[in-house]
Amino acid sequence: MRLVFAGTPAVALPSLRALIDSPRHDVVAVVTRPDRPSGRGRKVKPPPVHVLADEAGIPVLSPDRPRDPEFLATLAGLAPDCCPVVAYGALLPPAALAIPRHGWVNLHFSLLPAYRGAAPVQRTLLAGDDLTGASVFQIEPAMDSGPVYGVLTERVRPTDTSGDLLDRLAEAGAGLLVAVMDGIADGTVRPVAQPAEGISFAPKLTAEEARIDWTKPAIAVDRLARAATPAPGAWTTFRDRRLKIGPVRLGAVSGRPAGPVALPAGLPAGGLPAGQIMVLPGGDVAVGTGTSPVLLGEVRPEGRGPMAAAAWARGVRIAKGETLGAIGAMPVSGGTS
């Protein structure tokens, strides 16, 4: 089939590569979001999908808005049979949806109808789900509501970050997307309507949501830190400055379903008050939560790069009884990292 692929970030690359490599399909163009400033220097760079398309010699369309008449005319002129989509990042208008004869077919990283929306993987980790997956479905005007061509399942590992899980789903999902394209071309697959039960939504994880409340149970702190890694990054405050927190380690009593890490000796008999930070004799950095303490792994102080929590603690010389993140002590917009 003649395909016009739509996608923007790195998570879309496995699918684009798989479709380019498929002998059964011809990717005649790629649609991606316009170049944007990125990184610490805020230099304008093309998104990863644009870069791969250039390397493969595939024409790239980067409309500011997919409803622009010029873009719609160009798309119609390409006469695509189908438009596969992975993390494009913009809503497609009905005029665009009507152009390919087999419509637009999206790879979504959840088991629909669960977690419709922009952040299904992060919401999966926040909820503590053990099982997730990916769905390939027909795009309709309503968000992520179209009939489903196929699904795959993936176990959530106890230490998964959103980046880890998304990488696995992107690789596995690429094969599923190609299989669906093959089935559409052969006329052997038909989409099945999503059930009316089990619908949930996955809005983008905001910076405010990513702020750690140390009064919550250790398992909730663990889930938030993993869900927010690599973005937007879980965070707290220390001495009125923002401190990003990477994945933490839980003690055996903290509630992780598998793979507990016993906390080392040196903690007070009653544990630590919520938010209180303590450097243990072996150098580990413990923080109290609403249940049992967690051990910090990697942290990122405001204006600096990531570092081991032990190295950070040595540098700041934590005083006895110091705490992290008094709720309400700092506006969410304050500071940079």
From Swiss-Prot:
Q: Does the keyword Transferase apply?
A: yes
SUPFAM superfamilies, per this entry?
Answer: FMT C-terminal domain-like, Formyltransferase
- Keywords annotated in UniProt: Protein biosynthesis, Transferase
Superkingdom of origin organism: Bacteria
Locate the residues binding (6S)-5,6,7,8-tetrahydrofolate: S110, L111, L112, P113
Q: Which InterPro entries match?
A: Fmt, Formyl_trans_C, Formyl_transf_N, Formyl_transf_N_sf, Formyl_transferase-like_C_sf, Met-tRNA-FMT_C, Met-tRNA-FMT_N
Give the enzyme's main class according to its UniProt record, as a single word. transferase
What this protein catalyses is: L-methionyl-tRNA(fMet) + (6R)-10-formyltetrahydrofolate = N-formyl-L-methionyl-tRNA(fMet) + (6S)-5,6,7,8-tetrahydrofolate + H(+)
**GO MF term list:** methionyl-tRNA formyltransferase activity
Q: Does the keyword section mention Transmembrane?
A: no
Q: What is its EC number?
A: 2.1.2.9
Quote the cellular component terms of the Gene Ontology held in the record.
Answer: cytosol
Q: Which family does it belong to?
A: Belongs to the Fmt family.
Its function, per the record, reads: Attaches a formyl group to the free amino group of methionyl-tRNA(fMet). The formyl group appears to play a dual role in the initiator identity of N-formylmethionyl-tRNA by promoting its recognition by IF2 and preventing the misappropriation of this tRNA by the elongation apparatus.
The protein, known as: Methionyl-tRNA formyltransferase
Q: Lineage of the source organism?
A: Bacteria, Bacillati, Actinomycetota, Actinomycetes, Frankiales
